[in-house]
């Protein structure tokens, strides 16, 4: 179809497709990031995490295929914790400041969903924020009755008793969020590719006419 539209310039088909596909890939990344931010109530760390979506393969004349992906070793490939989303309060209460913590932390994932109190279950404690050695702030729960692996903090202080194992409160990973949004925007991207291809065809024909080739 592209070759037919180009007519005597049909030899430009691979180059036309390459430009159209790479343009669409760049536009798609921007679209995906915007839609993820519109759908999910991410905090600053969460917004950085979803930026792992990048163009991993550029289209060429020989292979007119571009790939957008979060790679398996990127932070965004792993199941995220609730600490990447909106929480109330937004800061951890650790050490002596624990006495100032609210009775229950609240959080949600989707912007159009209500904040939910993280009151815990029979096997797990209430959810609360902690800052890890890596400086990441995550939402965790204590696994009641299961002893922690370490009895001392990184600074060498003995942990309070009972010292129970911490587990992360999970939420969608960057990959999962982009996958959900892709299913919602696939038709839009197909139209973008068609528009970019037609635009590139018009440009090539106009350039050829200006040079007197056709």
Language model regions located:
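Short, Lys/Arg-rich flexible segments
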Residues: 1-214
